[in-house]
Regions:
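Long, contiguous binding/interaction regions
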Residues: 1-56, 62-106
Length: 106
C-alpha cells in the first residue's frame, strides 16, 4: 500500500500541478493538470478480518487537447514505480477538457 506521501512524490515527478479530489473553486490551474483520489478499497480478508489492505487509486490527467507526451510522462512514472494500471479516456464537453483516467490498486 502506498502512503499519501509516496503518491504525492510520484505525482511531483510528472512536473504537473495536482490536487487530491479537486482544486478549490477558482484555484484550478490551466491544463494540463492532475487530480487523484482513492474512491474505495479491495481489501483481502482472512478469518473475517482485513488481512491485506488494498486501496483503489485513480489518477486523472486533464488536458485541453490530446497530449500523448503528457500521458507518456505519467505512464513512465507509474511504470518506474511498478504500478499496474488500466487507462480510459473521455471528453468532458461541459468543461471542454479531455480526461485520461488511470485506475490502479495500491
Amino acid at each position: 500500500m502506498l502512503s499519501y506521501e509516496q503518491i504525492t512524490d510520484l505525482l511531483r515527478q510528472t512536473g504537473l500541478p495536482f490536487a487530491y479530489h479537486h482544486f478549490s473553486e477558482g484555484e484550478s490551474p490551466d491544463p494540463p493538470f492532475l487530480v487523484y483520489l482513492t474512491p474505495g478499497s479491495h481489501n483481502f480478508s482472512a478469518d473475517g478480518m482485513v488481512y491485506c489492505r488494498v486501496d483503489q487509486l485513480d489518477i486523472e490527467l486533464y488536458t485541453d487537447k490530446k497530449q500523448p507526451e503528457q500521458e507518456a510522462k505519467l505512464e513512465a512514472v507509474l511504470d518506474e514505480a511498478g504500478l499496474f494500471y488500466n487507462k480510459t479516456e473521455q471528453f468532458i464537453r461541459s468543461e471542454q477538457l479531455y480526461e485520461v483516467l488511470y485506475e490502479m490498486e495500491v
